[in-house]
């Protein structure tokens, strides 16, 4: 194919660029954006907004919501107890109530360096897979750490030794943008200390997980 004349090439380029500029301009809200949940959208915007039932939940179902919400909010206790509906805590655990991790039914957060525990963040444990673990991997997806299992539990009921302590340290990292603006970020470093049941597998893998939002619970 012979090369296009210079003027024709410029015209094709201009048309191509104008076509690229046909993308929609989101300068104002689209229909429905103000009620992203449709008929379930609630009007509250305060710290309790995630803890409310759907706006279209009929009154006859509000009792069911309240009962479920109480189980999510109230602490579990050691068995035996008169609170039989919520007993059975421990012997090892990460926290004694769902909402301790899913704060106000929202997202959790990593612990601060001086925190006494890692509530709202947990640590998953695994070791490298091998043919001998084929059935375990098929069932669980990973191979749990042999002593501490698949999830590190840093709390325990009285008389039981917790599995250890979870601590996160932070190193300041300075980041500079192209316009010269500088911001200081924090690089986290996970530390597992005071192991209560002996050393871990030397090739243990750690995965810190912050509790996700559980809106409406």
Give the ranges of each region predicted by the language model.
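Bacterial N-terminal signal peptides that target proteins for export
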Residues: 1-9
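Bacterial signal peptide processing site
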Residues: 21-23
């Amino acid at each position: 194919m012979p090369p296009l004349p210079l003027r024709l090439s410029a015209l094709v380029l201009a048309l191509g660029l104008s076509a690229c500029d046909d993308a929609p301009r989101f300068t104002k809200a689209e229909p429905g954006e103000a009620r992203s949940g449709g008929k379930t959208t609630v009007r509250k915007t305060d710290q309790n907004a995630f803890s409310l039932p759907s706006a279209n939940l009929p009154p006859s179902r509000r009792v069911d919501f309240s009962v479920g919400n109480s189980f999510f909010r109230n602490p579990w206790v050691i068995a035996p107890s008169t609170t039989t509906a919520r007993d059975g805590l421990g012997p090892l655990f990460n926290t004694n109530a769902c909402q301790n991790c899913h704060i106000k039914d929202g997202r959790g957060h990593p612990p601060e360096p001086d925190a006494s525990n890692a509530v709202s963040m947990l640590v998953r444990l695994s070791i490298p897979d091998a043919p001998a673990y084929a059935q375990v991997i098929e069932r669980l997806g990973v191979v749990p750490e042999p002593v501490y299992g698949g999830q590190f539990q840093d709390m325990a009921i009285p008389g039981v030794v917790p599995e250890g302590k979870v601590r996160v340290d932070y190193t300041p990292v300075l980041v500079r943008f192209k316009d010269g603006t500088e911001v200081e970020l924090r690089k986290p470093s996970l530390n597992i200390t005071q192991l209560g049941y002996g050393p871990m597998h030397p090739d243990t893998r750690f995965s810190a997980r912050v509790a996700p939002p559980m809106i409406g619970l």
